[in-house]
């Protein structure tokens, strides 16, 4: 049966489908007096089935094993009863009285149907090529043509906005006596200044609608107004709004819209949002969820032994826009992150605090990697960012010098990698000006002399439509400063459409950007509208991304080249051509799990009454973790959305659900190996095994 038809079945129609397609299963259920007998008879049936040891047979046995158990669901911290097959028995014997969606029984139908079907054929290279090429990029001429008209419309609106501003002290104001044409030309010139976009950013639904040509629906406007009344921050620059397509024809901009327009679920839950990443919750004197002791405040986040995140008390606590699926929405809700720029300028106390934060890195035995983020690292002014990098440099010098007095086996890890986390290459590429490039170049030159070997801008392009001529120029400048750029994608519904991610990899690779992570959306209710089931991520990994896979030797050779060449873009283009690859599959598809970190190693152990899969995750065995990992072991997560609900959502976006029909089969995942570029270099000495700043007692 076609996916579209199955997704529309009623419960009674679905019951008839079971009787027609899976008569043996129905017979076992009818002959079983209760759920326990059903599971026992099902166990016997599976044991004698010719496919007992294939993936389908193993999956059914796992569902039998966990039925009737309770597991601790880590994200909500509650006990969760599992009764997947007990519910199926009730359904097949006419005892199911609940008014419910069909999603649970559709998924179970697919699992039992797998016992009788051969393994599906994977899509061909030509098929994936066709699916990839349907997605335009911001470098395409027809896209640029629409955006030129958008820009002109927005420029006119900005002239009117400036005319009505009551702040003559602003650097962006009109002198008396200017004609409209002169004002328009002046605004056109200011467009190239990132400060203009921050000053003119949209902060209200009404203004947003005006800059989008009054194209938003009444329903959307009502929702955004409700969000504003609840105190949700709203911030979108004129540049980013010019990327949206308001014409009703041309390119599909859903991947852009879903990032700046809030869903009903997000608005409804705002105010009660919890931190998904439990290690982000810091209490003075107490270890975080990963067992790390951290300085007071919320400036350092840490999960792994080798790396910690630094969030400065500067404008770096703001962003160039608020992403609807932001992992730090919890911090925006608590006002630790915000868009009130005047309040975010560094205070006199920041320099003193920065020295204390640097001491944490300096005195830690294992830290060798610092990720400066926020907010957004590049939102800090050039001078402020330069001061932060200077502090990092001085800390690294002191740590290296102190090691000279320590014997072999007791030396501390020295700083090897510096990263800046920023979405501004996509949100506001004008920020990448000559002053910033010079700061980055100078820091790399001097830091390279003290053992720091990797300098990375960790950016976030969500769709090839964000890769504009301005973004391409910003990327070129950053690469020219000697820093590598890698990309992290959030695999929301719009980005998960077939071929979309392969196209993004392709476009970014051509410009010299290496893809790093493809993140599943966190599974709390506020993200329900944009959540993509992990099964789709595994499907993408095994069916689409496989055409860019590198051999271990090729991956090593490429990482060596990227660490030495002056032109990463030319290097990657040559590599792709030589190895006949459409893109580089260097990113890992993962979910950021509460406390234990990134992983895609899971098994499905049950399904909720709503059809949401219950996944048992294990940690990523390819990297070092906090010792607390031995105590946590495997963890359980309920997904935010059923597979059936996800497919219906894709259909509503114009997708053919049949293109995704193998998604049901992906009930287990395995975390991919890291691209060798991201492995830490060996030290020319032996460091201590002792972990400092650890407390996992209790």
Where are these regions (language model features)?
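Flexible, acidic/Gly-rich N-terminal and inter-domain linker regions that tether
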Residues: 2-304
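Conserved AdoMet/S-adenosylmethionine-binding subsite of the radical SAM
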Residues: 355-362, 378-551
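C-terminal accessory regions of radical SAM enzymes
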Residues: 236, 542-698
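Conserved alpha-helical substructure of the radical SAM core
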Residues: 318, 329-370, 383, 387-388, ...
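Glycine-rich, often proline-containing surface loops adjacent to acidic residues and nearby aromatics
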Residues: 304-308, 322, 364-373, 418-421, ...
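Radical SAM enzyme [4Fe-4S]-AdoMet core and its adjacent flexible, acidic
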Residues: 2-19, 23-30, 39-50, 67-68, ...
């Amino acid at each position: 049966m076609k996916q579209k038809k199955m997704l529309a079945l009623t419960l009674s129609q679905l019951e008839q489908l079971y009787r027609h397609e899976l008569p043996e299963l129905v017979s076992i259920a009818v002959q079983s007096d209760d759920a326990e007998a059903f599971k026992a008879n099902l166990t016997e049936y599976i044991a004698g089935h010719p496919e007992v040891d294939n993936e389908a047979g193993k999956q059914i046995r796992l569902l039998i094993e966990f039925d009737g158990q309770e597991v601790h669901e880590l994200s909500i911290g509650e006990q969760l009863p599992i009764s997947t097959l007990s519910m199926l028995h009730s359904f097949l014997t006419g005892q199911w009285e609940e008014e419910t969606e069909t999603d649970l029984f559709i998924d179970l139908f697919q699992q039992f149907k797998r016992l009788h079907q051969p393994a599906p054929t994977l899509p061909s290279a030509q098929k994936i090529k066709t699916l990839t090429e349907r997605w335009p990029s911001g470098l395409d001429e027809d896209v640029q043509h629409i955006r030129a008209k958008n820009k002109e419309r927005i420029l006119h609106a900005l002239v009117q906005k400036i005319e009505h501003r009551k702040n003559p002290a602003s650097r962006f104001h009109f002198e008396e006596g200017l004609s409209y044409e002169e004002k328009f030309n002046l605004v056109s010139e200011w467009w190239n200044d990132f400060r203009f976009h921050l000053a003119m950013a949209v902060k209200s639904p009404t203004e947003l609608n005006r800059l989008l040509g009054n194209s938003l629906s009444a329903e959307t406007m009502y929702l955004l107004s409700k969000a504003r009344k609840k105190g949700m921050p709203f911030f979108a620059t004129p540049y980013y709004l010019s990327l949206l397509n308001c014409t009703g024809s041309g390119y599909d901009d859903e991947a852009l819209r879903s990032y700046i327009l809030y869903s009903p679920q997000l608005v409804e839950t705002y105010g009660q949002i919890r931190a998904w990443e439990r290690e982000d919750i810091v209490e003075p004197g107490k270890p975080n969820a990963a067992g790390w002791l951290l300085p007071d405040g919320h400036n350092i986040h840490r999960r792994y032994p080798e790396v910690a995140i630094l969030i400065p008390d500067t404008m770096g606590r703001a962003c160039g826009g608020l992403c609807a699926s932001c992992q730090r929405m919890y911090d925006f809700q608590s006002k630790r992150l915000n868009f009130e720029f005047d309040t975010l300028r560094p205070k006199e106390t920041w320099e003193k605090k920065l020295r204390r934060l640097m001491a944490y890195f300096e005195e830690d035995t294992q830290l060798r990697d610092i990720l400066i983020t926020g907010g957004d690292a590049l939102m800090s002014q050039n001078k402020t960012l330069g001061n932060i990098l200077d502090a990092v440099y001085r800390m690294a010098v002191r740590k290296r010098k102190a090691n000279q007095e320590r014997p072999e086996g007791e030396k501390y890890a020295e700083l090897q990698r510096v990263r800046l986390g920023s979405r501004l290459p996509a949100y506001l590429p004008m920020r990448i000006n000559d002053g910033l490039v010079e700061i980055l170049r100078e820091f790399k030159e001097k830091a390279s002399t003290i053992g720091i070997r990797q300098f990375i801008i960790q950016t976030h392009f969500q769709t090839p439509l964000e890769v504009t001529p301005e973004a391409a120029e910003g990327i070129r400048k950053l690469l020219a400063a000697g820093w590598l750029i890698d990309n992290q994608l959030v695999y929301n519904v719009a980005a998960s459409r077939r071929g979309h991610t392969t196209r993004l990899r392709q476009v970014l690779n051509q410009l010299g950007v290496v893809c790093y992570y493809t993140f599943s959306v966190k599974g709390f209710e506020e993200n329900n509208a944009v959540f993509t089931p992990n099964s789709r991520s595994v499907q993408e990994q095994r069916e689409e991304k496989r055409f860019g896979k590198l051999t271990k030797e090729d991956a090593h050779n490429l990482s060596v080249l990227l660490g030495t060449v002056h032109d990463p873009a030319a290097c990657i283009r040559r590599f792709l051509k030589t190895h006949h690859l459409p893109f580089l599959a260097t990113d890992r598809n993962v979910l950021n799990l509460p406390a234990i970190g990134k992983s895609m190693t899971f098994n499905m152990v049950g399904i909720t009454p709503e059809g949401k899969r219950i996944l048992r995750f294990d940690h990523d065995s390819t990297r070092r973790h906090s010792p607390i990992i031995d105590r946590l072991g495997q963890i359980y997560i309920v997904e935010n959305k059923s597979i059936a609900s996800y497919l219906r959502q894709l259909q509503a976006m114009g997708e053919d659900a049949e293109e995704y029909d193998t998604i049901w089969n992906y009930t287990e995942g395995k975390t991919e190996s890291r691209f060798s570029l991201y492995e830490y270099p060996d030290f020319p000495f032996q460091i201590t095994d002792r972990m400092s700043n650890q407390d996992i007692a209790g």
